[in-house]
Amino acid sequence: MNEDKKTSRGRPKKFDRSHVLAIAQQSYWEHGINQMSINELCKLANVSKPGIYREFGGEDGLTCAVLEHYESRVLSLMLDFLSTETPFNEGLEKLAFYSTSEDRDSDMPKGCLFANMKALRLNLGEATAEQIDRTYEKVINSFEQWINRAKEKAEFKAAHMDSRFAAIYIYAQISFAQSQMMRGEKSEDVRAILRVALSVFG
């Protein structure tokens, strides 16, 4: 029994990748990706800096992995919503509400981590910047397909508008609104402004 204790005491702790990604995502999202150092993340996740570098190859690898994690668990919910058969105007209203909602009983931070990362793209590493570009294209393509389906059903008011341009416009308005949320603006005010910006389609 004593020998078992000695053996287990000498074993290195297993690096929990999922735990580190969850802590990093929450911290970057809540405070801003430019406000959290890798040393602070190591303390929060209770891991060593060499462990981070072994697992992710460095800070750039970590931020890239965090964005992939965020895309699969948060952004995917919004993109899945765009593929439903909800009428376009109703969907646009729900999107505006979802983008500017805050749940005080939830530990989910306000705003959008991806919008924050995209705004600071030039300050991030190469791998993260490339992932930002891939994620952005995925988001815009999803919006574009949603708009094209609305056009086919004659639900899109600005039928003459190029679908990709409209997709970029809608995402830009949502992204700005979420950035305002991260800066602490009242959700009601941000939502009202977003609704006005999107009213060209309603």
Language-model segments: which ranges?
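N-terminal intrinsically disordered/low-complexity leader segments
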Residues: M1-F15
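Helix-turn-helix
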Residues: N2, H19, I23, S27-G61, ...
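Conserved hydrophobic residue
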Residues: N34, F156, R183-K186
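Hydrophobic alpha-helical connector segments
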Residues: A65, L79-K110, S163-I170, R191
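Short, basic, alpha-helical segments at the C-terminal edge of helix-turn-helix-like DNA-binding modules
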Residues: E68-L75
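Amphipathic alpha-helical segments used for helix-helix packing
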Residues: G91, D105-A127
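Amphipathic C-terminal alpha-helical segment
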Residues: E102-D105, R149, A167-S187, S199-G202
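Amphipathic alpha-helical packing segments from all-alpha helical-bundle domains
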Residues: E126-K153, I168
